[in-house]
Amino acid sequence: MATSPKINRREHILQCLAQMLETSPGQRITTAKLAAEVGVSEAALYRHFPSKARMFEGLIEFIEDAILSRLNLIMDEEKDTMMRCQLVLQLLLVFSERNPGISRVLNGDALLGENERLRSRISVLFAKIETQLKQILREKTLREGQGFNLDEAILANLLLAVAEGRIAQFVRSEFKQKPTLHFDEQWTFIQQQLLRS
């Protein structure tokens, strides 16, 4: 007798939510629509998540785990300052491109009208990434004895703004304008400017 693999209902709900965020850009996702997509009642959704905010927190936890774990790998495996910065930005852009619905969460678009703590959590994630970029840039000064003409905090903010802007364009274009489009050429220019400073 063949047994079908047991579906992890929580993961399935989160996958459906991410899919709906991708296929319904600009629209608010209701628990009724999500329940219909998952194929269960709203009551069944609430057996797995006490609120819609907790569902979004589940997506945010996925985002944090995926991005921060890869960020740690970059820090462990790469020592060159400019390559580290490039890889951090590429990580954000590629992650967004591969997860269009989740890009709406990163961008804040999907969180409009939702619980404030969700937006705060995304803000904290971006603050961690910016802090990491600042640390990467400061280490260049320590290792090479030569820094930048601008404060590392200002440069880190600029670099993160580039990635956030590309993600915003991706969401605004309803996922047509890929965040990685022309990034290599743009990075070459940015790197030249950074190394001149």
UniProtKB/Swiss-Prot annotation:
Subunit structure: Homodimer. Interacts with FtsZ.
Keywords, comma-separated and alphabetical: Cell cycle, Cell division, Cytoplasm, DNA-binding
Name of the molecule in the record: Nucleoid occlusion factor SlmA
InterPro entries assigned to the protein according to its UniProt record, in alphabetical order: Homeodomain-like_sf (IPR009057), HTH-type_Tx_Regulator (IPR050624), HTH_TetR (IPR001647), NO_SlmA (IPR023769), SlmA-like_C (IPR054580)
GO biological process: cell division; negative regulation of division septum assembly
Coiled coil region boundaries: none
One Pfam family cited in the UniProt record for this chain: TetR_N
Gene that this polypeptide is encoded by: slmA
UniProt GO MF annotations: sequence-specific DNA binding
Organism: Shewanella denitrificans (strain OS217 / ATCC BAA-1090 / DSM 15013)
Lineage: Bacteria, Pseudomonadati, Pseudomonadota, Gammaproteobacteria, Alteromonadales
Key word Nucleotidyltransferase present: no
